[in-house]
Amino acid sequence: MANYLPITMGIGRKARSAHSDSNINEIKQKVFERDDHTCKCCGFKSQKYQDVLFKNGNASDTKAENMLTTCIFCHQCFNLDAVSEMRSGLLIWLPEIQQYQLHHLARAIYVARISQGPMADAARRSLDVLMGRREEAKERLGTDDPRILSMVLKP
């Protein structure tokens, strides 16, 4: 198994930073460069579709050693409240694979769905199989909505 940081479901704390938007973007770019534009949780490498995770959960603590590059899929797991705001995900029950593996699968499905022909058809069928796992999440967690889970997780 790859040596990735564990992905933990959670909610983000809002930043109360003295940094301007351009300052924080500059800091983020330095972190991305330091991490070679590679997600520390799944290994996905891209100059786009990355964000930073604050190791201590405090988005106001913008020291480089507190920040890690994460892809947008991994980042959303740590910030379930943002998932519901962006309407970009839902909860499924899929214990057979690791979360980071699901993220690689989701990216592949996303890319294949925008193509034409057999690849797109296979991607749609794969997505249908994953969506079928929502019911198990509802049974076990009481919901498949990240917003509801994020509300339960709030202190």
Q: Positions of the model-derived regions?
A:
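Extended charged
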Residues: 1-15, 76-155
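Histidine-centered nuclease catalytic patch
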Residues: 13, 20-21, 30-32, 38-70, ...
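Active-site recognition of the HExxH zinc-binding catalytic motif
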Residues: 24
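Alpha-helical segments that scaffold the active site and NAD(P)H-binding pocket
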Residues: 73
